[in-house]
Amino acid sequence: MRLRFSLLLTVSLLAGCASAPPATLQHRDNIRDFSLEGRFALRVAMPDQAPQSSGGRLSWTHRNRSDRVLLSSPLGYGLAEIETTPELSRLRTAEGKQSESTDPDTLIEEVTGQRLPVTRMPAWLLGRSGGKAQIFNDPIGRPGKLLEDGWQVDYTYDDEAPAALPSRLNISRDGEIELKLRIEEWKETP
């Protein structure tokens, strides 16, 4: 019985790792609203503290300067929901705790203790500047690396098309914080 469960779990995890490459949508500069499905892994290694890691799945919808991000465990159990609008940001946990702030970056810092660039993420996901970033293109003209305010974003593509959207992002700051995103599906939202 135990062997069967282990085998079933292994097969399920391997099946979850197989995914189709992200779709090629219209040119990234024209994309305003989008949604994506994928996985994340976050590692925080602060001086004088043991490194902390977490990971799971995410579902992100960006529409008209508002975002809704659902985070779940690798097995699909809800962990948190983050909603941001230009006026208010709200974070709800699976335990029912709720926090609000007028600034999403401040909200995440209050809840996690880490200043994460939440407001810049929609632009960074598409390989655009969230402000005054330096963007270095790959050999076929797509964003390959972005540098902004101490953050570095490295982009990887599964599709060779020049208009392809990234399938992997590695977002890091000073070796202290590393967020890896594996985007399994991009959709343009009308």
Curated annotation (Swiss-Prot):
The organism's place on the tree of life at top rank: Bacteria
CDD domains: LolB
PROSITE patterns from the UniProt entry: PROKAR_LIPOPROTEIN
Record GO biological process: lipoprotein localization to outer membrane; protein transport
Subcellular location field: Cell outer membrane
A GO cellular-component term linked to this record: cell outer membrane
Keywords annotated in UniProt: Cell outer membrane, Chaperone, Lipoprotein, Membrane, Palmitate, Protein transport, Signal, Transport
Any Pfam family hit: LolB
Location, primary (coarse class): membrane
Membrane topology value: Lipid-anchor
Keyword Protein transport: yes
Lipidation (N-palmitoyl cysteine): 17
Residues with a covalently attached lipid (S-diacylglycerol cysteine): 17
First and last residue of the signal peptide: 1-16
Quaternary structure annotation from Swiss-Prot or TrEMBL: Monomer.
Described function: Plays a critical role in the incorporation of lipoproteins in the outer membrane after they are released by the LolA protein.
Recorded family membership: Belongs to the LolB family.
Official protein name in the record: Outer-membrane lipoprotein LolB
Organism classification: Bacteria, Pseudomonadati, Pseudomonadota, Betaproteobacteria, Rhodocyclales
